[in-house]
């Protein structure tokens, strides 16, 4: 794990389902391709994931890793806590409003150079 850099965003105001839709598009890609893909997606989740990815890139640069040789080795979104509220409905009923949060994890690694 010495050749990895990570960034974690906790309590993002975003449901994990919506975050995973964007995350699945960039999993395993190199960082230049991933940033290009994220910049073209018109979703709030793309902006949030892009911010976390840029943070991971900055962490990798701080650790002295080669920025041009990085790829997304692992990325996932987990479910955070849920705020539960109730809204009144017809005939005296109430339904629950679930405000979902996410924890987004991004791990970057350097590509291994093959000797020939």
Curated annotation (Swiss-Prot):
Q: Where are the transmembrane segments?
A: none
What GO cellular component entries does it have?
A: cytosolic large ribosomal subunit
Key word Phosphoprotein present: no
Report which superkingdom the organism of origin falls in.
Bacteria
Q: Name one Pfam family in it.
A: Ribosomal_L22
Question: Which NCBIfam families does the protein's record reference?
Answer: rplV_bact
Q: What does this protein do?
A: This protein binds specifically to 23S rRNA; its binding is stimulated by other ribosomal proteins, e.g. L4, L17, and L20. It is important during the early stages of 50S assembly. It makes multiple contacts with different domains of the 23S rRNA in the assembled 50S subunit and ribosome. The globular domain of the protein is located near the polypeptide exit tunnel on the outside of the subunit, while an extended beta-hairpin is found that lines the wall of the exit tunnel in the center of the 70S ribosome.
Q: What is this protein called?
A: Large ribosomal subunit protein uL22
The protein's organism comes out as Sulfurihydrogenibium sp. (strain YO3AOP1)
* Gene that encodes it: rplV
């Amino acid at each position: 794990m010495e050749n990895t850099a990570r960034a974690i965003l906790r309590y993002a105001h975003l449901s994990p389902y919506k975050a995973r839709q964007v995350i699945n598009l960039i999993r395993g890609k190199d960082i230049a391709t991933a940033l290009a893909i994220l910049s073209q997606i018109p979703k709030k989740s793309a902006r949030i994931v892009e911010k976390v990815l840029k943070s991971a890139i900055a962490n990798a640069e701080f650790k002295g890793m080669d920025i041009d040789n990085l790829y997304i080795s692992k990325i996932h979104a987990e479910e955070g806590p849920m705020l539960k509220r109730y809204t009144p409905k017809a005939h005296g009923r109430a339904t629950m409003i679930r405000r979902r949060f996410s924890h987004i994890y991004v791990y970057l690694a350097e590509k291994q150079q093959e000797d020939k």
